[in-house]
Amino acid sequence: MQTISATYGNLSLVIPAFQEENGIRQAILEAEEALSNLNLSDYEILIIDDGSSDSTYKAAQETAALYSHTRIIRHEKNLGYGAALRTGFEASRYEFIAFTDADCQFHLEDLAKLFDNIKNSDIAVGYRFDRQDPKLRIFLSRGYNLLVHSLLGSGVKDCDCALKLFRKNALNKILPEARNFFVNTEMLHKAACHNLNITEVPVRHRMRYAGKSKVGWKEVPKTLKTLVPYWFSNHLFNASETQGTISKEKKGNLLAYFTGCVILLLFSALLFGARLRTPLLEPQEARYAEVPREMLLNNEWVVPLLHGKPYLDKPPLSYWAVMGLYQIFGIEDWAARLLPCLCGIAIILVVVSWGYFAGAPWEGLLAGFILCLTNRFIYLERMLAPDSLLCLWTTLGLCLGYLACTQKKMNLACWLGYSLCIGLGFLTKGPVALVLLAVPIVLWTFLDKRTLKPSLGMWGFALITAILITLPWQIAVSIREPDFFHHFYVGQNLLRYVAPLDHEEPFWFFLPHLFLGTIPWIFLLPGFITTICKPNSNKQSMGSFAGFGLIAGVVIFTFFSIGGSKRPIYLLPVLPPLAIILGCQVMALVTQKREKIVWQSILIPGTEGSFNFLGIILLIGLGISFAGIFRGLLKPDTGFLLGFLFLTSLCIWVIVKAALPDKKMSFAVTGAFLFLTLYLGVSELLPAYNQLFSIRGQLRAHLKFEKKKPSLVVCYPHLWDSAPFYLPETEVISFSRSEKSQMILFLNQRPNTLLLIKSGKDRKELVQELPQHLEFITDAQQGTVTVGWIRKKSDEHLQGNLVP
């Protein structure tokens, strides 16, 4: 008798089973018959009963007793399809391991095809070329395969086909963690990450032998709940943060890092500390300087005051901070502006420290530089408003929340700091702080499975801490002002968000502000998206630090975009997470070997000579734009717009010019150029702009030749907050549009009155309606508000030298 030599080696076949009492016998019979005819040296069949409550286990035992190759392993409770497979894989003894389902939908003779194709591969997977499932099952499977291919770039036609063959050493590298039907996707993605060779083989398919499929609509959300976090943690942001850690052995790296920190601190101090004496702009800065002034003069620490009346639109923390600065430095506009400037420097330091403690020090340092050299951040964070302080609490809170959840066990000190930031943010701007700080942490801990998920008790602790911080003030102000709750929570928060009375803008309102305000760094964003979404499964360029920055930035940006009321300063909390994203992208660019840098895609010069000529033209255009403003050749708005366009183009030109050949030098030159440009802006352009368009500048111009300060100032159509701030000893009254006739009568009785009126239509109508013997005299350049005198036409101006 001729003996047939074995050609395939030893095989372990794993068959998970759950509630398969009517089909498990047939599954074992078919497996024994097919494997006995496969020319195997030896084989074993492992039936994994996943806690079935029917007679699956009993039927499997009875059938296995007839064969020496079949073993039964039982879970005491149902752990899931993936858990059953892993149990079988770990119990397997042989060099080749295959698995199939207990529904008998595959012809196990096709394992021979898989063996034939695994000779030069690590894994052989089947794909069903003649699928016999119900239409719903086929629809769900095809949709899922399309989704997996789009997200993970697996490249496998039929990833959930339950007929696969592995080499044991390869399988040990990709053992699944998922317990549900996501197990196939997970193993294939891990195989791609380990550069394992995968061969696809067509296999036959048929209807179930008995029972009902366990896959249906109910499995879709369960699988997505596993797929999306896996995609986020293992594909988009799968790098280890320790890759960028500063090597202690290399003192040069440590010296370079701390030198960079010192330079960044110097840049921040110069950009935020320059020309703080610029006048306050209406209406925002003047209001938030006047409220703490009135509170301080009235020794009022509970109820914010504006024009002597309760002003309950915002909580008092930013007012308290400005009051403290007034007490130290006196009631000055520059003292009030110290608050946002100190907040701006602190935010940059928080971002750098965040990266350091997160294991991404260079990314954090680069993010700090990008934030410091972002024109929108410098402009908005120098502006006096509660949003500046809110941005600090938001950034610090997100940093501490991130660090609390990325340790081996929950860092209670960081979580306490996170909780305090929620309370302080609430005391600065209201319940919006809870949304900005809680939603990113909740979403991130769901998506990134490498993190610790805060328990309900931890969230309760955070909420109680925030309440303890804010409740004393809320109780005190409610006792004094019974209408506080409705005005603050309903009017200023809920209705302002869903049905605003002012500042209502379309959904896309922030997009142009974000784009123009972050040039040139925003051009890194497409490269960042390309980097994280590229199909290479084994890429490792971005880690959890970048992932959290993306989540936080998207959540905050979306929240404010959905809201009805929109103002440009609401963008502030978005900018630190965006800087983190772009800092990680810069780090990826300067550390990866690439022939071309991303900036080169912005502009491709025809020749070196023409490119240099373009730079000269842009520089000349920039100079002409701002020279035209100060010489009166161009309107200020036109000149600033042209100057900004030329400046932006020049920034891009410098970046492209510096991109060859050293990428690090490219970004260094770009940063230096941006710093010089921004410093010019904050030291010369912004003060000039504020001087031209603020009320302080116009008041000085009109009072320059007066012998004494005016005893009365009239405001129309509302009270301008700069008037009482800069003329604290002067009586200030206001008239609304409905009171125009009374105002004209009042001015007729009180000529020689200083009038502050809104420019445009209001000013034009008033001039037309004044009595013939009165005239409105204004010599100062108009801004939002026009300042002038109401005088009798025969009056002569008194000469003097009084300058407030």
Predicted regions and their residues:
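Membrane-integral, polyisoprenol-dependent glycosyltransferases
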Residues: 250-599, 724
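Hydrophobic helical membrane-anchoring modules
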Residues: 1-9, 153, 176-258
